């Protein structure tokens, strides 16, 4: 199976982990194995890599790609289960690329792309509710909230209203059917700079896969799963994710919270983390090779104190 995916911020991410040859590393979103392969090549026989992905197609590709790597463990699961996967082990480095893979976008039948007509699916794991289920069963208020909050779409109200109106006549089953509804819901001037469906498709994909609801607690678990001196590196692709990661990382670095007028600290809080990479974006060279890296941001944090 071909699982074409160009890893973004490749060197920046791998270098951010400060890889130790004998260390334990986790790729929470291994995909086609680009970042994972670079890590595995830097490990000794004593080192170990755990490559996790929720997509069964990715898992099959990873099994083939790492068949000759006895120290690479392939796990079909979601990153919010990292504590159970590690089962008490502590990692020297953990990475997560939160974007949809190129394979998922370019495989029409997965239903992620608004550029190809296909069944409305958008499931990363091929399990649970699909995009069609969301579009055809959620109330107008629920759709409005999702499109507004997860897509930051200014025309969310009219899009939600038209979705509900159109589905009364016929079930909305394909990506292009949804695109047509979105286009009729906004003025022409709103379609000049980018595809009109981009924000709504993002919102529905986030809802289908529970991306943001799982992320906040998963970041806590990832950080807790590090050894002291271990590094967590996360790549985000939209502002909602990036703000969440930035805020969570800041909380790990927070020290004393006593009022300024207190002569001495009584709360006992000291920083648990130290920021090592602060929102690095793709270079001009990478953008020319891979335009999809435009919105990618890398943030890294080193654990300096145990929980």
Language model region names:
Residues 1-307:
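S-adenosyl-L-methionine-dependent methyltransferase catalytic core, i.e., the SAM/SAH-binding region
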């Amino acid at each position: 199976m071909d699982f074409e995916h160009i890893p973004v911020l490749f060197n920046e991410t791998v270098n951010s982990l400060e890889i130790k040859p004998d260390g334990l590393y986790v790729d929470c979103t291994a995909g086609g194995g680009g970042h994972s392969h670079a890590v595995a090549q830097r490990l000794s026989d004593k080192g170990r890599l755990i490559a996790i992905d929720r997509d069964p197609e990715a898992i099959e590709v990873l099994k083939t790609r790492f068949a000759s790597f006895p120290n690479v463990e392939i796990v079909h699961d979601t990153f919010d289960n990292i504590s159970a996967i590690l089962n008490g082990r502590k990692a020297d480095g953990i990475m997560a690329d939160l974007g949809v893979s190129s394979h998922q976008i370019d495989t029409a039948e997965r239903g992620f792309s608004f550029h190809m007509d296909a069944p409305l699916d958008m499931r990363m794991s091929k399990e649970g509710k699909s995009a069609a289920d969301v579009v055809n069963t959620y109330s107008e208020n629920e759709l409005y909230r999702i499109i507004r909050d997860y897509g930051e779409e200014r025309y969310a109200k009219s899009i939600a209203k038209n979705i509900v109106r159109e589905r009364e006549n016929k079930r909305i089953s394909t990506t292009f059917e949804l695109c047509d509804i979105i286009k009729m819901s906004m003025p022409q001037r709103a379609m000049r700079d980018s595809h009109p469906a981009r924000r709504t498709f993002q919102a529905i994909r986030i809802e289908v896969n529970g991306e943001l609801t799982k992320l906040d607690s998963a970041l806590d678990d990832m950080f807790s799963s590090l050894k002291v001196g271990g590094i967590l590196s996360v790549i985000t692709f939209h502002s909602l994710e990036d703000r969440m990661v930035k805020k969570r990382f800041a909380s790990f670095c927070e020290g004393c919270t006593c009022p300024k007028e207190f002569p001495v600290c009584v709360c006992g809080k000291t920083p648990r983390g130290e920021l090592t990479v602060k929102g690095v974006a793709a270079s001009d060279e990478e953008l020319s090779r891979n335009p999809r890296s435009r919105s990618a941001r890398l943030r890294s944090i080193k654990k300096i104190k145990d929980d």
